[in-house]
């Protein structure tokens, strides 16, 4: 079986070429060809000796996930469904803004966590994505979006906020992050790459030590009682532990704050008392808040908070001195908005089956 070189960051690629008896600079050449030029085969790499290209063709490959579907929203948001084999597909989303282009990348086929308000969580879980399948999403998006009139890449920011919990696929995510940041890869700044987590505390500490990019935490509740219900991981790592981990992360973080993501669920977590509890909860954590109006999906059981409740909630936080943004709903007409990504998941957890039985029972 041929080795997929897309699975390697520069360090891994250098080791691979050393094993082939080649000098380290070959790794940099090949990395630039793959990620900066978008090369899909070794014959395109004209500055490599023919003998090396022949050897690479025999022993290795550049295997990129195949494109299954591409959609474009009325607001310019783009969504791609990529084939990762055995009937599974993952989604990646490009969100254009006036000052940046952000790509939202998936890390797993489905998600092993069961956040109750998330469409991906309802799909169950199949497996972790390889580093090649993660970075392949950025490869595809760069190819599709091209460059600006100034010859700059359209994609300037990456957020690991697609399907899956990135921290649960730690090693492959870190390899992909390394490629994103490498000057021979995509050359992104650590400040422009964000990893989102539901609160896997040990992995947050590991990421701080090996790849401290910007961090977003899917908080969604101001107390353990509510968070236990909607983010079951909280039962393992309750809010006190999570806040302490956030403080530790900031020691090495590229930004001097944590972004707390907070989906606004009508009657669940959107009252004024919840906002005041939040202020108390994050007292010792430099942070900003990103309030996310819930994006409905079929049979979710939740409703989006009213605009008035969101406004009051935001105002309470702002009056306490916090930077607060209310996320614009983007791409919801193609199910590309936050919490709507589902892809195609061959579920190994029977979670899809469980939810179908619950819905049948409710209808009966």
UniProtKB/Swiss-Prot annotation:
Leading EC class:
transferase
Obligatory cofactor(s):
[4Fe-4S] cluster
Active site residues of this protein: 91 (proton acceptor), 338 (s-methylcysteine intermediate)
Give GO BP annotations, semicolon-separated: rRNA base methylation; tRNA methylation
Q: Note on file?
A: Reaction proceeds by a ping-pong mechanism involving intermediate methylation of a conserved cysteine residue.
Species: Neisseria meningitidis serogroup B (strain ATCC BAA-335 / MC58)
What is the protein name for this chain?
Dual-specificity RNA methyltransferase RlmN
Q: Does the keyword 4Fe-4S apply?
A: yes
**Subcellular location(s) of the protein:** Cytoplasm
Report the SS bond pairs: 104-338
Which reaction(s) does its UniProt entry say it catalyses? adenosine(2503) in 23S rRNA + 2 reduced [2Fe-2S]-[ferredoxin] + 2 S-adenosyl-L-methionine = 2-methyladenosine(2503) in 23S rRNA + 5'-deoxyadenosine + L-methionine + 2 oxidized [2Fe-2S]-[ferredoxin] + S-adenosyl-L-homocysteine; adenosine(37) in tRNA + 2 reduced [2Fe-2S]-[ferredoxin] + 2 S-adenosyl-L-methionine = 2-methyladenosine(37) in tRNA + 5'-deoxyadenosine + L-methionine + 2 oxidized [2Fe-2S]-[ferredoxin] + S-adenosyl-L-homocysteine
Cofactor binding: number and manner: Binds 1 [4Fe-4S] cluster. The cluster is coordinated with 3 cysteines and an exchangeable S-adenosyl-L-methionine.
Q: Name one Pfam family in it.
A: RlmN_N
Name the gene that codes for it. Answer: rlmN
Q: What terms describe the molecular function in GO for this protein?
A: 4 iron, 4 sulfur cluster binding; metal ion binding; rRNA (adenine(2503)-C2-)-methyltransferase activity; rRNA binding; tRNA (adenine(37)-C2)-methyltransferase activity; tRNA binding
**What the protein does?**
Specifically methylates position 2 of adenine 2503 in 23S rRNA and position 2 of adenine 37 in tRNAs. m2A2503 modification seems to play a crucial role in the proofreading step occurring at the peptidyl transferase center and thus would serve to optimize ribosomal fidelity.
């Amino acid at each position: 079986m041929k080795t997929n070189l897309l699975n390697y960051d520069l360090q891994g690629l250098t080791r691979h070429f050393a094993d082939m008896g080649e000098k380290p600079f070959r790794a940099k050449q090949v990395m630039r060809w793959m990620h900066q030029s978008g090369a899909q085969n070794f014959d395109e790499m004209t500055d490599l000796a023919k003998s090396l290209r022949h050897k690479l063709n025999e022993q290795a490959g550049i295997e990129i996930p195949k494109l299954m579907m591409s959609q474009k929203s009325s607001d310019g948001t783009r969504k791609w469904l990529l084939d990762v084999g055995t009937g599974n597909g993952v989604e990646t989303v490009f969100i254009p803004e006036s000052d940046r282009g952000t790509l939202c990348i998936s890390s797993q086929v489905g998600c092993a966590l069961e956040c109750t308000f998330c469409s991906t969580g309802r799909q169950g879980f199949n497996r972790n994505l390889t580093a090649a399948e993660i970075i392949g999403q950025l490869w595809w998006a760069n190819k599709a979006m091209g460059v600006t009139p100034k010859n700059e890449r359209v994609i300037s920011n990456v957020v690991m906020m697609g399907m899956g919990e990135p921290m649960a696929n730690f090693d492959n995510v870190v390899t992909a992050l390394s490629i994103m940041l490498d000057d021979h890869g995509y050359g992104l700044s650590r400040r422009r790459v964000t990893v989102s987590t539901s609160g896997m505390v040990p992995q947050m500490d590991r990421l701080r030590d090996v790849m401290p990019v910007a961090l977003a935490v899917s908080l969604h509740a101001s107390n353990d009682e509510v968070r236990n219900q909607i983010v079951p991981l909280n039962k393992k790592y309750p809010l006190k532990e999570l806040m302490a981990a956030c403080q530790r992360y900031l020691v090495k973080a590229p930004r001097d704050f944590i972004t707390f993501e907070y989906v606004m669920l009508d009657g669940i977590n959107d009252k004024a008392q919840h906002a005041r509890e939040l202020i108390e909860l994050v007292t010792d954590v430099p942070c900003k808040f990103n309030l996310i109006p819930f994006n409905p999906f079929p049979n979710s059981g939740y409703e989006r908070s009213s605009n008035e409740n969101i406004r009051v909630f935001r105002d309470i936080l702002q009056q306490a001195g916090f930077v607060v943004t209310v996320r614009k709903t983007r791409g919801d007409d193609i199910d590309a908005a936050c919490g709507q990504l589902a892809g195609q998941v061959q579920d190994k957890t029977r979670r899809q089956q469980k939810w179908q039985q619950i819905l049948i029972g409710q209808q009966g």
